[in-house]
């Protein structure tokens, strides 16, 4: 027994048995996690079983597995696929006649990181849709362009919805006191033709005033872009970060008119950074908005325009494989906020 446990899990027999007790020592957990990070499938299976627990340890382990799956935490090159398969096996067990009503398996019957990873792994479209329904419920598009159909949940070319983008960016804003991030909006109201960015700026100024770094996520109809108002040398500047083709002149003019409300009177104080970054990140405008906020929150006193211009230039130097990996991992990291 000792030899078997040690060869499979690199744990002593007492350490292995302790995994099924109420308290698991930090040392035992660290040993198991180390093996998981190295891609030990037996340990991955074991850790996924621990993640089923509905206590603090279960939630901690589930989060760690998702961090490895989403690339937030580094592991072996194929770690996400191994975690995927382990979660899929658990999902299949959770839905057999014996266990389907067992509360110990509830994380695989309700929105959770484990269920999301299982859905990512299955190639059965009907199962994928069934799992997506459990995760998303009945969602409705806020604009005609939003793709909220459950069959697209794991699609690598799916446009992010307002709610997904809001959940993720508000989560980032809570982690960074340097940024104020507003709920995503459309630029122009579809029926009244009202400039919604202007309205949101007026409301923000009336309620609390603009912060030193005020972020607005704006949808121009079928595309997300980031609009940042910030102070540089005591002067208010406006920065538009657009990761697709150049905006048309009407759209630019609507943004310029809105910027006047923030106190910007000269066009030289409005900077449009426009670079197509989506060749290998299809419909990735929302992903870049999210990542941009991450960059800005870590930029300190650096000029935001310089930070984002350098990011765009550097991103285009990445290989196709690296850009594709960015697409996959960022989508997973963003959706995690909707699972909390």
Swiss-Prot record:
It comes from the Bacteria. The keyword Protease applies. One of its GO terms (cellular component) is host cell cytoplasm. One of its GO terms (biological process) is proteolysis. Disulfide bonds: none annotated. Keywords: Host cytoplasm, Hydrolase, Protease, Secreted, Thiol protease, Virulence. It is found in: Secreted; Host cytoplasm. Transmembrane segments: none annotated. GO terms for molecular function: cysteine-type peptidase activity. Its EC number is 3.4.22.-. The active site is at 223, 285 (nucleophile). It holds the Pfam family ElaD_SseL-like_N. Effector proteins function to alter host cell physiology and promote bacterial survival in host tissues. This protease targets the host cell ubiquitin pathway by acting as a deubiquitinase in infected host cells. NCBIfam families: PRK11836.1, PRK14848.1. Belongs to the peptidase C79 family. This is Deubiquitinase SseL. It comes from Salmonella paratyphi A (strain ATCC 9150 / SARB42).
